[in-house]
Design a protein with these regions (language model features):
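The first (N-terminal) embedded transmembrane alpha-helix
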Residues: 9-32
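Juxtamembrane helix-capping/reentrant segments at transmembrane boundaries
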Residues: 67-85
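Membrane-proximal soluble regions of multi-pass membrane proteins
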Residues: 137, 143-187
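Alpha-helical transmembrane segments and their membrane-interface junctions
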Residues: 88-111, 175-191
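Helix-coil boundary and interhelical linker segments in multi-pass alpha-helical membrane proteins
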Residues: 28-39, 98-113, 221-225
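Loop-to-helix transition at the N-terminal end of transmembrane alpha-helices
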Residues: 37-53
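Pore domain of cation channels
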Residues: 169-176, 184-224
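Transmembrane alpha-helix/helix-exit interface in multi-pass inner-membrane proteins
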Residues: 119-144
Length: 225
């Protein structure tokens, strides 16, 4: 009989997306059945919230050892996932602008639902990018360091501290890119990773611009009431 404690393994990274998407679609369908206003925003917000909860719950299990062994898991195309998520974010943002600029004043509940889509969408994109960074980092496995004779990852990010990076390290890196569109204390060391960081930085810049525009638009709208 096996002894010792067994560690519950996390879902595959794309399973998180699939489960969250199903929950979001169910919420959207329920909103349509109940004829709730802003059904698109409700579905988007539930998808975002479900994904974030699942990612946060799985972070402690995304150890360096697990990521190294499972980096090759690609049960859904990454580009397709990002494309679907960006479409959902766009729908949520468009719903917000339509709500702000319509002739009839929005009530507090409608504004809250619409406004939540922006921070939740922002966090979802960067959480998704964090998992992509993590798996891309460990995709090529380990290499032997010629000086120390130790096995080191060849993933393209140089985290300070000398320890194997875990899920929270990649979430930190992704959030820094999302907030500042630049790196902080982590160096990018390969061309492949630089391309990913470049796309992420450009996306973050435009998303942050949309957030500022939405805030200004909302302030003007509320000031005219």
């Amino acid at each position: 009989m096996a002894t010792g404690t067994t560690t519950k393994m996390p879902m595959r990274r794309h399973t998180l997306f699939a489960v969250s998407a199903c929950i979001g679609v169910a919420a959207f369908g329920a909103a349509l059945i109940w004829r709730a206003p802003l059904a698109y925003s409700i579905g988007a917000n539930v998808f975002f919230a479900a994904y974030l909860v699942l990612v946060i719950a799985h972070m402690p299990r995304l150890t360096g050892s697990y990521l190294r062994k499972n980096a090759g898991d690609t049960d859904l195309p990454v580009l397709a996932i990002f494309a679907v998520t960006l479409v959902v974010v766009a729908i949520a943002i468009i719903s917000l602008f339509q709500l702000i600029n319509r002739e009839k004043s929005a009530d507090a509940v409608e504004l809250t639902v619409a406004l939540l889509s922006i921070p939740l969408g922002w966090l979802t994109i960067h959480a998704m990018a964090a998992l992509h960074y993590a798996h891309l980092y460990w995709l090529d496995g380990d290499a032997m360091d010629g000086d120390t004779k130790k096995r080191i990852p060849v993933g393209g990010l140089d985290f300070p501290g000398g320890k194997r990076p875990e899920g929270s390290d990649f979430l930190y890196f992704s959030t820094v890119i999302g907030m500042t569109a630049q790196t902080a204390d982590t160096n990018v060391t390969t061309s492949q990773m630089r391309r990913v960081v470049l796309v992420h930085s450009i996306l973050s810049f435009f998303f942050n611009t949309v957030i500022v525009a939405a805030a200004v638009n909302l302030a003007v709208s509320l000031g005219s009431l």
